[in-house]
């Protein structure tokens, strides 16, 4: 049975993550406040960031950038900006 949480990103009740995906205090916050749906949206943005900016997840500076962008996206309401990308019209 899945857990239900209040997702602070989506501003609604939603299925929570099955387990903590990120280490430390930030990981606990993500586990408690971010839904599967919101995490999936972040994963898509993260993939775009890695590909477009040619980031290497083995590089500590690149990992730090990804973490900063993740916090901005999930908790501060900022969208990920990628040069030259225009989101599709809804």
From Swiss-Prot:
Annotated GO MF terms: iron ion binding
InterPro entries xref list: Fe_traffick_prot_YggX, Fe_traffick_prot_YggX_sf
The keyword S-adenosyl-L-methionine is assigned to this record: no
Coiled-coil portions: none
Domain of life: Bacteria
GO BP annotation list: cellular response to oxidative stress
Keyword annotations: Iron
Assembly mode: Monomer.
Matching NCBIfam families: PRK05408.1
Name of the protein this chain belongs to: Probable Fe(2+)-trafficking protein
The organism of origin for this protein: Proteus mirabilis (strain HI4320)
């Amino acid at each position: 049975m899945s857990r239900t949480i209040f997702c602070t990103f989506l501003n609604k009740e939603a299925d929570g993550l099955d387990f903590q995906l990120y280490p430390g205090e930030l990981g606990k916050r993500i586990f408690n406040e971010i839904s599967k749906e919101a995490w999936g949206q972040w994963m898509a943005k993260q993939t775009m960031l890695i590909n477009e900016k040619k980031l290497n997840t083995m590089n500590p500076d690149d990992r730090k950038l990804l973490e900063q962008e993740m916090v901005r996206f999930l908790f501060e309401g900022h969208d990920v900006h990628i040069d030259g990308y225009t989101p599709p019209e809804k």
